[in-house]
């Protein structure tokens, strides 16, 4: 928006392309504050680059001309990753999440699913790596559900330790949800990185995630905010064999 205004004033020159990623097009506070500026940007800017088809549709609904919209996918450099051999889940099932500890990551739903897994007698361990404003809330849930022997929150870890923990994991979990303020994911890079090294992924039918993961073909998706469906999926995964696992990787 600022760049478009500066170009009109002759301060800068050239075409203006704007990327739309996540909170900038989903948070109610952001949209309430910036929608008038976005409307001006749609007229003054040259190209809008949403990172998903979902966001492209939202831009059109907000009044952006379709000819100015081009979906620009995010990605990861596959040369940085080495695929691991197929790893059939062991006992206990090793689940891992690597994420900033915020509401939209859905880790509170994951912990509720863990409570259900424990009640069903599923043998599992769950590591949540990361820091963020929801840390205390998540730790309280773990204590409330008496999951201290099943769920671990080591906090921030350097990259080499994260890699070692990922290598040990059977499944990468990111149960993203829409925040109370409307904040949503774009398409999480953490999922892309897990898929790049061949770690099975379980996530949700949230935002642009279904554009990355085709359920039962390149991972598994469940409805967001549905701890029972998540527990069902993880319990089923704990018994998967190599023949069923290989096509999904």
Where are these regions (language model features)?
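Nucleotide-activated donor-binding/catalytic signature segment of Leloir-type glycosyltransferases, i.e.
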Residues: 137-160
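Acidic donor-binding loop of glycosyltransferase active sites
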Residues: 167-182, 199
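Short acidic/histidine- and often glycine-rich active-site loop of Leloir-type glycosyltransferases
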Residues: 203-216, 220-221
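Short hydrophobic beta-strand element within catalytic cores of glycosyltransferases
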Residues: 191, 196, 200-203
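Short alpha-helical donor nucleotide-sugar binding micro-motif in glycosyltransferases
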Residues: 156-157, 164-169
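Conserved acidic donor-binding segment of nucleotide-sugar-dependent glycosyltransferases
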Residues: 215-216, 220-227, 235-242
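Carbohydrate-associated surface elements
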Residues: 54, 75
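Conserved donor-binding/catalytic core segment of Leloir-type glycosyltransferases
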Residues: 49, 87-105, 111-114, 127
């Amino acid at each position: 928006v600022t760049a478009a205004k500066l170009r009109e004033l002759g301060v800068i020159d050239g075409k203006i392309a704007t990327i739309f990623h996540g909170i900038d097009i989903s948070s109610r506070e952001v949209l309430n504050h910036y929608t008038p500026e976005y409307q001006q940007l749609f007229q003054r800017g040259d190209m809008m680059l949403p990172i998903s088809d979902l966001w492209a549709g939202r831009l059109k609904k907000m009044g952006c001309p379709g000819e100015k919209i081009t979906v620009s996918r995010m990605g990861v450099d596959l040369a940085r990753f080495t695929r691991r051999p197929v790893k059939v889940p062991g006992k206990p099932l090793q689940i891992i999440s690597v994420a900033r500890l915020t509401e939209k990551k859905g880790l509170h739903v994951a912990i509720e699913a863990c409570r259900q897994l424990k009640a069903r007698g599923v043998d599992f361990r769950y590591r949540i790596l990361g820091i963020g404003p929801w840390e205390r809330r998540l730790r309280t849930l773990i204590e409330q559900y008496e999951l201290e022997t099943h769920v671990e929150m080591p906090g921030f870890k350097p990259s080499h330790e994260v890699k070692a923990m990922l290598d040990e994991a059977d499944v990468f979990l990111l149960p993203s949800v829409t925040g109370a303020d409307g904040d949503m994911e774009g398409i999480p890079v953490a999922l892309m990185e897990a898929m790049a090294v061949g770690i099975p992924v379980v996530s949700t039918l949230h935002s642009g995630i279904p554009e990355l993961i085709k359920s039962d073909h390149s991972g598994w998706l469940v409805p967001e905010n549905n701890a029972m469906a998540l527990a069902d999926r993880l319990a089923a995964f704990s018994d998967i064999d190599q023949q069923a696992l290989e096509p999904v990787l």
